[in-house]
Amino acid sequence: LSAISDYEIESTVMVPTHFVRLLDLPKGVRDKYDVSSLKMVTHTGAACPIEIKQNMIEWWGPVLFEAYGASEVGTTCSITSEEWLEHPGSVGQARPPFEAIIFDDDGSPVERGVEGRLYFRDKTGRGVVYHNDPEKSAAAHIEPGVFTLGEIGYLDEDGYVYITDRFSDMVVSGGVNIYPAESEQVLITHENVLDVACIGVPDKGMGEKLLALVIRDSSGVSVTEEQLISYCRDNLTHYKCPKKIEFISDLGRTTMGKINKRKLRAPYWENFQG
């Protein structure tokens, strides 16, 4: 905030974790800095909870610009603040040369509003190419030029894309599909939660159960597992909420705000005997 104010920064790139930490600052601290020079704040790297983004737009104005895509293909979708306020939660419409398509598990296109696997048709025919990994490149395609980045989502009637989770992150507990992102977006709004990641861990009875790994903020060291589970249940259907919460100090986020959930899951599965 000091740099934005002192140097009259006009554009910058952030991830949602930055927004959460900025909003956690006391209002008196935030109000000390002039951020009126900002014209564009691009955010990417991770999903941004609706409440967090709304609060940032109220504070900084309609300068947030969200980009969704991958290093291997660039930006596939984008959305301005003005568009987002009309389509809250969306990552935007597909941008040329891409077209967004939702498929079911059998590879058939689904109707607008129906959740499924998010794919993009690259009208250049290139698709996604992972460096020195032809097998991964091939596995990402359902047909030539039509690829997925691994997300689950849906399209609204106006063609805006909404992402609900990732294929690989989905937890199957007692035959029910649970999307960790739903719990994450609730828990991150708790005043004592600085960061969170939900993962599937082994459960002999249910196959998997949802575990939330939580970083508490410095003022929330006394918040308990029971309090956070109760908070989640107050805001989400019970079966979608974590069965257990562990408090940790680091989620291993990259500089782009991404978390390697496979790495987080590994210790729980290594010695599990089903």
Residue ranges of each PLM-predicted region?
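Gly/Ser/Thr-rich phosphate-binding loop
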Residues: 1-4, 9-14, 23-87, 99, ...
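AMP-binding/adenylate-forming catalytic core of the ANL superfamily
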Residues: 4-5, 12-15, 109, 121-122, ...
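Glycine-centered tight turns that cap/initiate beta-strands
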Residues: 37, 61, 97, 192-195, ...
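Hydrophobic/anchoring residues in structured secondary elements
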Residues: 40-43, 198, 246-247
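Active-site glycine-centered loops adjacent to acidic/histidine catalytic or metal-binding residues
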Residues: 45, 69, 92, 151, ...
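Adenylate-forming AMP-binding core of the ANL superfamily, especially NRPS adenylation
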Residues: 47, 86-132, 140
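Acidic/polar alpha-helix N-cap and adjacent early helical turns
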Residues: 267-274
